[in-house]
Design a protein with these regions (language model features):
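Short beta-strand elements of ligand-binding domains
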Residues: 119-120, 148-154
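General small-molecule cofactor/ligand-binding pocket signal
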Residues: 44-46, 92-96, 150-152
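Small/aliphatic-rich secondary-structure junction motif
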Residues: 6-59, 144-145, 153
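Acidic, proline/glycine-rich short linear motifs
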Residues: 47-73, 159-166
Length: 166
């Protein structure tokens, strides 16, 4: 199910996974799916699009926005297949446009069932990635309704994550 808004279908908790085009995000989705099955939780996938910066080129901006939305939908389909393979259930899919930490915070505030945020950490020497770094340095970004953050190291194997998920 894809939407711009969260839906509350039942009273189970939800694990929020940020879906972006990097291997560590896929590992986070894998782990969240496994944990959801063990915890009787649901998974919600969030893809965040950066708004185009062509203010006076409205046609170009709309074309770019449509292409980005199509790419996000395709990415969410891939992530959804992974989550369903692990949890046995279709995840909820949400696409938002804006600044990543702001959109994450808004979605958490809007959907009281979201209980844990799953992020993948990069294996690059430059650090775990901008989103993980932002939230580690300023957890107040999620202060309106703080929730635990599970950071899945990109260097872990799926077998290691299977053992951890139970």
């Amino acid at each position: 199910m894809m939407s711009d808004e969260p839906s509350i279908e039942d009273d189970r908790i939800k694990f929020l996974v940020i879906a972006d085009d990097c291997p560590e995000a896929r590992l986070a989705a894998f782990f969240a799916g496994r944990r959801a099955k063990r915890s009787n939780a649901r998974v919600i996938l969030l893809s965040i699009l950066e708004p185009p910066e062509f203010g006076h080129w409205a046609t170009v901006a709309e074309t770019m926005r449509a292409e980005a939305h199509e790419k996000a939908q395709a990415l969410l389909r891939e992530f959804a297949a992974e989550v369903k393979a692990q949890s046995g259930e279709d995840p909820e899919e949400v696409i938002r446009e804006g600044i990543d930490v702001e959109e994450i915070r808004k979605l958490i505030d809007e959907d009281p069932a979201i209980s844990i945020l799953f992020l993948g950490a990069s294996t690059e020497t430059s650090g775990p990635g901008p989103l993980v770094s932002s939230l580690a340095q300023k957890p107040a970004y999620l202060a309106a309704r703080p929730i635990p953050v599970t950071v899945v190291p990109g260097s872990m194997s799926r077998d290691e994550l299977r053992r951890l998920a139970g």
